[in-house]
């Protein structure tokens, strides 16, 4: 016999992605490839893409949760760029992180200067006093 065949030897274990090993949804392999191809450093460690993918996943989940809340507040079931804008600009830390970022079709935060608001009339209070 040639020594080749199904009998003998261990069966190869099912391949497991680095994302599933790390318990992530974001692609660790793709992040690793992009780090290598991007000329950020001569060498890229094995833990770096896992950490970066985890950070990206966390930030994405945080923004999507706040945007989902904004959509629900507006009685909508689909997140649109306006909801992303409201979520980011109303959160102090995310607004600082993404301060220079422009979101297409995001609009602006509703804001009216206090001096432009109508003044409360005092005649109502004087009438009660008499």
Swiss-Prot record:
The modification N6-glutaryllysine is found at residues 96, 100, 119-120, 126. The modification N6-succinyllysine is found at residues 10, 96. The modification Phosphoserine is found at residue 2. The modification N6-lactoyllysine is found at residue 10. Residues 1-22 are annotated as: Disordered. One of its GO terms (molecular function) is structural constituent of chromatin. There is a cross-link at residues 14, 16, 120 (Glycyl lysine isopeptide (Lys-Gly) (interchain with G-Cter in ubiquitin)). One of its GO terms (cellular component) is nucleosome. The keyword Ubl conjugation applies. The modification N6-crotonyllysine is found at residues 37, 119-120, 126. The modification Symmetric dimethylarginine is found at residue 4. Keywords: Acetylation, Chromosome, Citrullination, DNA-binding, Hydroxylation, Isopeptide bond, Methylation, Nucleosome core, Nucleus, Phosphoprotein, Ubl conjugation. InterPro entries: Histone-fold (IPR009072), Histone_H2A (IPR002119), Histone_H2A/H2B/H3 (IPR007125), Histone_H2A_C (IPR032454), Histone_H2A_CS (IPR032458). Residues 7-19 have a biased composition (Basic residues). GO terms for biological process: heterochromatin formation. The modification Citrulline is found at residue 4. It is found in: Nucleus; Chromosome. Core component of nucleosome. Nucleosomes wrap and compact DNA into chromatin, limiting DNA accessibility to the cellular machineries which require DNA as a template. Histones thereby play a central role in transcription regulation, DNA repair, DNA replication and chromosomal stability. DNA accessibility is regulated via a complex set of post-translational modifications of histones, also called histone code, and nucleosome remodeling. Belongs to the histone H2A family. The nucleosome is a histone octamer containing two molecules each of H2A, H2B, H3 and H4 assembled in one H3-H4 heterotetramer and two H2A-H2B heterodimers. The octamer wraps approximately 147 bp of DNA. Interacts with VRK1; the interaction is mediated by the nucleosome acidic patch, a cluster of negatively charged residues of H2A and H2B forming a cleft within the nucleosome core. This is Histone H2A type 1.
